[in-house]
Swiss-Prot record:
It comes from Listeria innocua serovar 6a (strain ATCC BAA-680 / CLIP 11262). It is found in: Cell membrane. The keyword Zinc does not apply. The keyword Cell membrane applies. Pfam families: Sugar_transport. This is Putative sugar uptake protein lin0215. Keywords: Cell membrane, Membrane, Sugar transport, Transmembrane, Transmembrane helix, Transport. It is a multi-pass membrane protein. Its main location: membrane.
Length: 286
């Protein structure tokens, strides 16, 4: 039963990119809708929990919210450039490599020979998965789009990795972080989406996009609960399975076109990224 609960974050997070893309809208509208959804859910959670706020908790959580918006906005841009089925495994892989290396360098997580061995195998699998997933048939337009998408995902991953490092470094409790983090998301989204497009940021589509924002936030709360039930290492590993839902959903539901060879590379790449993510979780608990 605990494992089933721990799979909820992967299920929720895996469906979010599909819902966002299906709803459509500009990157600005999607960013505002997502952050407003996260804030709405955070306010609801606030009334049903008993968070403890300190200056450090509020300040760091607010900053992580800003970093999340950077990560999310650039990830949304990547969806439009190279598609969900290609962007998600690459993004997940980059985040796994980034957070793992920061954990090793800053927090000395690989403190045994077994963890070092498992960790390097995991990184090799993830890097291999990224390489395979990013494969594109030699078409000039596709190659240029891939380069642009990769640059966009690097910026996105820097935001996400920075968020994780700050939360871990300052030992911020998940429940305590939710509301100030969501406030940081919305305020930074307002600033980042102020210019850069002619379309309105706030319309009916923006309101519709609040739904995936709430789903993401629900996954975040579920992750906090899952970690308490099965431990951080197992919870982290299981959360990586969401990329499978996003990738397959992008191909099947969103009808993202791929050649037979690209399809094979994507499937194998996703498997490698997931295995690498699970192995990182094993290394954390070893």
């Amino acid at each position: 039963m605990n494992i089933m609960i721990a799979l909820i974050p992967a299920l929720l997070w895996g469906t979010v990119p599909l819902i966002i893309t299906k709803f459509g809208g500009s990157t600005r509208q999607q960013t505002m809708g997502m952050t407003l959804g996260a804030l709405t859910f955070a306010v609801i959670v606030f009334f049903f929990t008993d968070p403890v706020y300190t200056l450090k908790t509020v300040g760091i959580s607010f900053i992580t919210g800003c970093l999340w918006t950077v990560g999310q906005m650039f990830q949304l841009r990547a969806f439009k450039i190279i598609g969900v089925s290609k962007a998600m495994p690459i993004s997940t892989g980059m985040q796994l490599v980034g957070t793992t290396l920061c954990g090793v360098i800053l927090f000395h997580e690989w403190d045994t020979t077994l963890r070092i061995i498992l960790g390097f195998i995991a990184l090799a699998l993830i890097v291999g998965g990224i390489f395979l997933t990013s494969y594109a048939e030699k078409e000039e337009d596709g190659t240029n789009a891939l380069k642009q998408g990769l640059i966009t995902l690097v910026i996105s991953s820097l935001g996400y990795v920075g968020l994780v490092v700050l939360i871990q470094g300052f030992k911020i409790d998940g429940i305590n972080a939710i509301l100030p983090q969501a406030i940081g998301m919305v305020l930074s989204a307002l600033i980042m989406t102020h210019s850069g497009g002619t379309e309105k940021r706030f319309n009916k589509r923006t309101l519709l996009l609040i739904i995936p924002g709430m789903i993401w936030a629900a996954g975040n709360v579920a992750m906090v609960h899952a970690n308490q039930l099965v431990g951080v290492a197992t919870g982290f590993s299981l959360s990586q399975l969401g990329v499978v839902i996003s990738t397959i959903g992008g191909i099947v539901l969103l009808k993202e076109k791929k050649t037979q060879k690209e399809m094979l590379y994507v499937i194998v790449g996703v498997v490698l990224v997931v295995l690498g993510g699970i192995l990182i979780g094993v290394a954390k608990g070893a």
